[in-house]
Regions:
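N-terminal accessory/interface modules of nucleic-acid-binding and processing proteins
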Residues: 1-289
Length: 289
């Protein structure tokens, strides 16, 4: 448990330090990246989940391919000298048996392990994607279909704002032509779609309606991270998502919450991942139909 506490505090302090040094949060990248998308395990091709995505977003590497030391070695690759691993985690369920009643119970225990980026590999030309011309046209149909499959109620209007209204269970957003780019429109829509999952019939998240309250800021953080995960899923550059820079009202609340509770970002990332998984489940249902 002591090691778990240290890991929570280490990740939290790294995020705070990252913000202080870069004046941005780790999931906001002010540049385009030819290797954009979710950070993945090079061996399994699976995406890292929740807090692990955020930890890997803080790395200085552009490649989104990662592996453990042994997995790189088994594939015939060698690390560059003095390469340092990036610590990430998983939760292992431990069993406890009550000596009096013989009843079994389980509790999650955090386990830490290290991964290395493809850019830390010697002779890595086969691992690094070549820069591609940036597409000016977003695959709009793909995201439109994704949103439509959720059956979320979308209301377009001409005001310069976007929000999810709980009591009507509807998403309100400006017309796409009012945005600077289609990227900004869809990133904003995905942000509000993450809010939409808070409804009691979906992920059932409780949130305060008071602007700038801790509960309100926490829900905004969940939607912020959820939108980023979805942008990565659709391989959209966060550099194009100007909405990510519009949360200065919440940053002080987030930083204070991080300082007060080392598990705060872990909880938010877990809720964001749960929301994304919920939204993705609609796509699986449609494909199976």
């Amino acid at each position: 448990m002591h090691n778990s506490k240290e890991f929570y505090e280490s990740v939290t302090n790294n995020i705070i330090d990252f913000y202080n040094k870069n004046n941005r949060l780790p999931w906001v990248r002010p540049w385009s990246n030819s290797n954009s998308g979710f950070n993945i395990s090079f061996t399994t091709k699976k995406e890292y989940q929740g807090i692990n995505q955020i930890i890997l977003m803080m790395s200085p590497y552009e490649s989104n391919k990662w592996n453990t030391f042994n997995n790189w070695k088994n594939l015939g690759f060698h690390l560059k000298k003095k390469s340092k691993g990036t610590p990430i985690c998983y939760f292992q369920m431990n069993k406890v048996v009550d000596k009096k009643t013989d009843e079994e119970s389980f509790y999650p225990m955090l386990k830490k392990y290290y991964v290395y980026n493809a850019e830390q590999i010697e002779n890595n030309s086969t691992l690094i994607d070549k820069p591609k011309p940036k597409n000016k046209i977003l695959p709009i149909d793909e995201i439109d279909s994704y949103v439509k499959n959720t059956n979320a109620k979308i209301v377009e209007h001409v005001t310069n704002e976007a929000f999810y209204r709980p009591f009507t269970d509807s998403i309100h957003i400006s017309n796409i032509n009012q945005f600077k780019s289609s990227y900004d429109y869809y990133a904003t829509l995905l942000h509000e779609l993450t809010h939409w999952t808070m409804h009691e019939s979906r992920c059932n998240r409780k949130s305060s309606n008071r602007f700038k309250s801790v509960g309100y800021a926490y829900e905004e953080l969940i939607a912020e991270i959820g939108s980023t995960f979805l942008c990565n899923q659709f391989k959209m550059d966060s550099a194009s998502h100007t909405n990510l820079q519009n949360h200065v009202n919440y940053i002080s609340s987030w930083l204070q919450a991080l300082k007060d509770d080392p598990k705060f970002i872990f909880k938010a990332a877990a809720e964001s991942q749960k929301a994304v998984n919920f939204l993705n489940s609609f796509q699986q249902i449609v494909k199976a139909a």
